[in-house]
Every structure is written in structure tokens, then in C-alpha cells.
Curated annotation (Swiss-Prot):
The keyword Ligase does not apply. One of its GO terms (cellular component) is stromule. Residues 80-239 form the Thioredoxin domain. Keywords: Antioxidant, Chloroplast, Disulfide bond, Oxidoreductase, Peroxidase, Plastid, Redox-active center, Transit peptide. This is 2-Cys peroxiredoxin BAS1-like, chloroplastic. The active site is a conserved redox-active cysteine residue, the peroxidatic cysteine (C(P)), which makes the nucleophilic attack on the peroxide substrate. The peroxide oxidizes the C(P)-SH to cysteine sulfenic acid (C(P)-SOH), which then reacts with another cysteine residue, the resolving cysteine (C(R)), to form a disulfide bridge. The disulfide is subsequently reduced by an appropriate electron donor to complete the catalytic cycle. In this typical 2-Cys peroxiredoxin, C(R) is provided by the other dimeric subunit to form an intersubunit disulfide. The keyword Secreted does not apply. It comes from Arabidopsis thaliana (Mouse-ear cress). Its main location: plastid. GO terms for molecular function: peroxiredoxin activity; thioredoxin-dependent peroxiredoxin activity. Homodimer; disulfide-linked, upon oxidation. Interacts with the plastidial thioredoxin CDSP32. Interacts with the plastidial NADPH-dependent thioredoxin reductase ANTR-C. Residues 1-72 form a transit peptide. Its EC number is 1.11.1.24. It is found in: Plastid, Chloroplast.
């Protein structure tokens, strides 16, 4: 056997072994959380997998449909990527200095949801984000949107924090609930849990009225998020859902010019900038 054949055989063996050693993503998920299975199973043929992208393929095979199909379905099997239904949860929360129950699916058909995760109570960047969202809550309310903050702390910790004055590092009264993810199952289901630390990254998800995740960002622990950008993204999302034949260019804000997703019609936008 030639050296090239031996090398090729060894490479094939290593690749085959590496596939055996890879852990299943589903083993990392909470057993209490269910997800929509959008793509074929791993045993499907490559042709079957390709057929899973039929919604994307229509963008090139059907010109008339392409102008109305710019909200693609995610092809994720496990993690709640954009385009998938948000994992449902029910948990205790603190609102108006009382303990309440929050169930995500109860907002379906009623409101958009801004769901954001933060690492821990009584920390440093976290209160600046939480109070910033609270101070702008009326603006979100006008957009038919609920805000939910989530951390792995208990409801007792949440309560103590809202009962602490802002000038002392507390939150004061908030205009939206703080959810307790003390079992860490919610953070895990949304893919933001740091396993070896047991806390969540700064994940933020915009969920539409159908319960579908339309936007997500995940910041590392030391980087705070922008309420302005969250608001702008929410407004852009609502605009394109109300105007499915249009898309929003970079930095778009309400009242600014949108774009027709068509090679000819888009020239109207580009000629005006």
C-alpha cells in the first residue's frame, strides 16, 4: 500500500472516530423543555436535508413569491434560534413587590415579548440594564410589548433587590416582572447558561405574538445592552410584519424609507440615499 493510501485511510479513520465522540446537543438541554423539530433527523440523506431548505429555495425559484418571503424558518433542531418557537416556561417572578407566576405561552396571540437574561442580582452592569428597561417601559407598552427579566436568583433575592434604593445599588420598583430561573432550566433552554459558573450570559430575545423568536443577541458578562437598539429592532420587526413586501435597511427607524426586496424596485431606495 502506498504512503498516500495509508495517509488517506488514517485520515478517514480519524474523521470517523471524531463523529463517534461528538456529544449530542440534545443531551445538554433540560428534559422539561420541548422544542419544535423543524429539520429532518440526523439519519436523513443529504437530499432530504436539502429539501428542508425549501422555504429558502423559493427565494430563487419563484420570483413573485420571493418578494413576500423574507421571514425564513430556522433549521435548528435543538437550540431556539431565530425563526423557531420560543421554549415555553412557567416560573415564579417578582412584580410590584409580590410573588407571581409567569408563563411565556400566555402572551401568544396577545403581545410581543422582550425576554432578557442577566447574570446575578446585586451586581454592577445588571442594575443599569434592568432600570433602563423599566424607565422606558411605557414606550414598549405602546408597542404592545411585555418585558421580562430573568436570572438564576431566587424570588427572595429579586424581592430584596427591588426593595433596595437605586442609589444603594438596588432597583427600586420596576414596571415589569423579574423571573426566577433558580433551576437554570430556562437559561439552559435558551442557550445562554454558562455551565461551569451556573449563571446566564446577557442574552436578549424578541418574541413575536406567534411565540416565534425574531431577534436574539448574546453579550458577554461585562458588556451592557442598549435599550435604544432593542426598541429600534422591535419597531423594525413590527414594520416588516405589517408590510411583508418591504425590508428595513441598516439603522432604519420609524418614518424613514424602507426598501423593496427586488433588484429593480430597490433602485428607488438606493437612488435616494
Amino acid at each position: 500500500m502506498s504512503m498516500a493510501s495509508i495517509a488517506s485511510s488514517s485520515s478517514t479513520t480519524l474523521l470517523s472516530s471524531s463523529r463517534v465522540l461528538l456529544p449530542s446537543k440534545s443531551s445538554l438541554l433540560s428534559p422539561t423543555v420541548s422544542f419544535p423539530r423543524i429539520i429532518p433527523s440526523s439519519s436523513a440523506s443529504s437530499s432530504s436535508l436539502c429539501s428542508g431548505f425549501s422555504s429558502l429555495g423559493s427565494l430563487t425559484t419563484n420570483r413573485s413569491a420571493s418578494r413576500r418571503n423574507f421571514a425564513v424558518k430556522a433549521q435548528a433542531d435543538d437550540l431556539p434560534l431565530v425563526g423557531n418557537k420560543a421554549p415555553d416556561f412557567e416560573a415564579e417572578a417578582v412584580f410590584d413587590q409580590e410573588f407571581i407566576k409567569v408563563k411565556l405561552s400566555e402572551y401568544i396571540g396577545k403581545k410581543y415579548v422582550i425576554l432578557f437574561f442577566y447574570p446575578l442580582d446585586f451586581t454592577f452592569v445588571c442594575p443599569t440594564e434592568i432600570t433602563a428597561f423599566s424607565d422606558r417601559y411605557e414606550e414598549f407598552e405602546k408597542l404592545n410589548t411585555e418585558v421580562l427579566g430573568v436570572s438564576v436568583d431566587s424570588v427572595f433575592s429579586h424581592l430584596a433587590w427591588v426593595q433596595t434604593d437605586r442609589k444603594s445599588g438596588g432597583l427600586g420598583d420596576l414596571n415589569y416582572p423579574l423571573v426566577s430561573d433558580i433551576t437554570k432550566s430556562i437559561s439552559k433552554s435558551f442557550g445562554v447558561l454558562i455551565p461551569d459558573q451556573g449563571i446566564a450570559l446577557r442574552g436578549l430575545f424578541i418574541i413575536d405574538k406567534e411565540g416565534v423568536i425574531q431577534h436574539s443577541t448574546i453579550n458577554n458578562l461585562g458588556i451592557g445592552r442598549s435599550v435604544d437598539e432593542t426598541m429600534r429592532t422591535l419597531q423594525a420587526l413590527q414594520y416588516v410584519q405589517e408590510n411583508p413586501d418591504e425590508v428595513c435597511p441598516a439603522g432604519w427607524k420609524p418614518g424613514e424609507k424602507s426598501m423593496k426586496p427586488d433588484p429593480k424596485l430597490s433602485k428607488e431606495y438606493f437612488s435616494a440615499i
